[in-house]
């Protein structure tokens, strides 16, 4: 399939604690994207510092790492046509107040510090994040029987 790509999506501790995992996964499945990998884990501080390295000079960096380490996260890799761009649209804006109803953040969030989900912002970021969170053998290649009903 042309333009098929992968993205990294992580349900943050607030999304896990609020029981939104199933709803979020359901939205990606119903859109037609294919789950390639998933881990339910407590991310180490070192992993989180590397993941958010671009934000290391921001005043909220330490609090972000502490918060993300405070509970389990669901780390996932999704695959599909333009999944990075479409996934970001499905998530909504980083600040939930700017997110439209129908998006994950628009439907389930109020404050930016508790915006329940992370999604790669580019194909390059997705590749980096996937390599950081998953070993190559953890990515499962398979053909979904639904693909013929989703893509021409």
UniProtKB/Swiss-Prot annotation:
Any GO MF annotation of the entry: nucleoside diphosphate kinase activity
Classification via PROSITE patterns: NDPK, NDPK_LIKE
SMART domains, A to Z: NDK
InterPro entries: NDK-like_dom, NDK-like_dom_sf, Nucleoside_diP_kinase, Nucleoside_diP_kinase_AS
PTM text: The N-terminus is blocked.
Activity regulation behaviour: Autophosphorylation at His-118 increases serine/threonine protein kinase activity of the enzyme. Interaction with the SET complex inhibits exonuclease activity.
Catalytic EC class: transferase
Keywords recorded for this protein, A-Z: ATP-binding, Cell membrane, Cytoplasm, Differentiation, Endocytosis, Kinase, Magnesium, Membrane, Metal-binding, Neurogenesis, Nucleotide metabolism, Nucleotide-binding, Nucleus, Transferase
Cofactor: Mg(2+)
Pfam family, one: NDK
Gene3D superfamilies per the UniProt record, alphabetical: Nucleoside diphosphate kinase-like domain (3.30.70.141)
Keyword Translocase: no
Binding site for ATP: 12, 60, 88, 94, 105, 115
Chief site of localization: cytoplasm
Subcellular localization(s) per the UniProt record: Cytoplasm; Cell membrane; Nucleus
GO BP annotations listed: cell differentiation; CTP biosynthetic process; endocytosis; GTP biosynthetic process; lactation; nervous system development; positive regulation of epithelial cell proliferation; UTP biosynthetic process
A cellular-component GO term for this protein: early endosome
Catalytic activity: a 2'-deoxyribonucleoside 5'-diphosphate + ATP = a 2'-deoxyribonucleoside 5'-triphosphate + ADP; a ribonucleoside 5'-diphosphate + ATP = a ribonucleoside 5'-triphosphate + ADP
Catalytic residues, chain numbering: 118
Keyword Nucleus attached: yes
UniProt superkingdom: Eukaryota
Function: Major role in the synthesis of nucleoside triphosphates other than ATP. Possesses nucleoside-diphosphate kinase, serine/threonine-specific protein kinase, geranyl and farnesyl pyrophosphate kinase, histidine protein kinase and 3'-5' exonuclease activities. Involved in cell proliferation, differentiation and development, signal transduction, G protein-coupled receptor endocytosis, and gene expression. Required for neural development including neural patterning and cell fate determination.
Stored PANTHER family: NUCLEOSIDE DIPHOSPHATE KINASE
Self-association state and partner proteins as the record states: Homohexamer.
Family assignment from sequence similarity: Belongs to the NDK family.
Protein name per its UniProtKB record: Nucleoside diphosphate kinase A 2
Source organism phylogeny: Eukaryota, Metazoa, Chordata, Craniata, Vertebrata
């Amino acid at each position: 399939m042309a333009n098929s790509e992968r993205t990294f999506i992580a349900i943050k501790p607030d999304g896990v604690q609020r029981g939104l995992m199933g709803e979020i996964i359901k939205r990606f499945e119903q859109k037609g994207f294919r789950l390639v990998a998933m881990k339910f884990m407590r991310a180490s501080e070192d992993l989180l510092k590397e993941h958010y390295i671009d934000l290391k000079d921001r005043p909220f960096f330490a609090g972000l790492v502490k918060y993300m380490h405070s509970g389990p996260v669901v780390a996932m890799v999704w695959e599909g046509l333009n999944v990075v761009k479409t996934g970001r649209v499905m998530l909504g804006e980083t600040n939930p107040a700017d997110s439209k109803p129908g998006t994950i953040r628009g439907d389930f969030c109020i404050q930016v510090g508790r915006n329940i989900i992370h999604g790669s912002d580019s194909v390059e970021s997705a590749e980096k994040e996937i390599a950081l969170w998953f070993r190559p053998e953890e990515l499962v290649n398979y053909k979904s029987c639904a693909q013929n009903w989703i893509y021409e």
